[in-house]
A protein has these predicted regions:
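Glycine/small-residue-rich interface belts in oligomeric ring/scaffold proteins
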Residues: 4-69
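A short glycine/serine-rich beta->alpha loop
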Residues: 4-14, 43-49, 83-90, 117-123, ...
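Electropositive phosphate-/nucleotide-binding environments in soluble metabolic enzymes
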Residues: 17, 33, 37, 53, ...
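Flexible, glycine/charged-enriched surface loops at secondary-structure junctions
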Residues: 36, 111-117, 168-170
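Internal, conserved structured core segments that host functional sites
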Residues: 56, 61, 65-137
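A contiguous pocket-lining binding segment that forms or flanks enzyme active sites
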Residues: 122-170
Length: 170
């Protein structure tokens, strides 16, 4: 199954995630993150209490809505997902990554329903967890596998940013 093979490489999926740090630079500038231990704690806190947690909840809800073919609720949840980040920069990150994922998945692993779903999604503003949830649901990837891959990608991108910023070595 293509998705199962790709889960281990999910953090490298072509969404431009390497260009974003989810606010890690600001955390460094404010002295919150200054090395390996504080980076791990920062990532843990983000997973438990930050936007990745909100993303995981939204991913699960969108997944289940898509499985039920409830496109009216999908439209409402997709619009709600645009409002869940606490900072406009995080929303922008999620939109750029979501749109990139949606374009890549539509061309590399198409599904007959993707075209009709387009009218229920915010035009050019598909946040990342929404795009992942729809693709996973339509291709019958288990929701738990999808959630784990999504969150693993967040952590891997955070570690990559930590290396780039000199917080940890390679």
């Amino acid at each position: 199954e293509p998705w199962a093979q790709g889960i281990k490489d999910f953090s490298g999926f072509p969404v431009g995630g390497f260009a974003y740090s989810h606010g890690l630079e600001a955390a460094m500038d404010n002295g919150i993150v200054d090395g390996k231990n504080s980076l791990m704690e920062w990532l843990r806190g983000a997973l438990l209490f930050g936007s990745p947690n909100n993303d995981a909840i939204m991913l699960k809800e969108i997944y289940e809505t898509t499985i039920r073919n409830d496109y009216v609720s999908l439209k409402e949840l997709s619009s709600l997902a645009l409002t869940l980040n606490v900072a406009s920069e995080l929303t922008d990150e999620s939109i750029v990554q979501g749109n990139a994922f949606w374009r890549a998945i539509r061309s590399s692993w198409p599904h007959n329903d993707f075209s009709c779903l387009q009218e229920y999604l915010p035009k050019n503003k598909i946040v990342y967890p929404v795009a992942v949830a729809i693709a996973a649901a339509k291709h019958e990837v288990p929701v738990l596998s999808s959630l784990l891959a999504y969150l693993q990608a967040f952590v891997m991108n955070g570690i990559s940013a930590g290396i780039r910023l000199g917080l940890i070595g390679q």
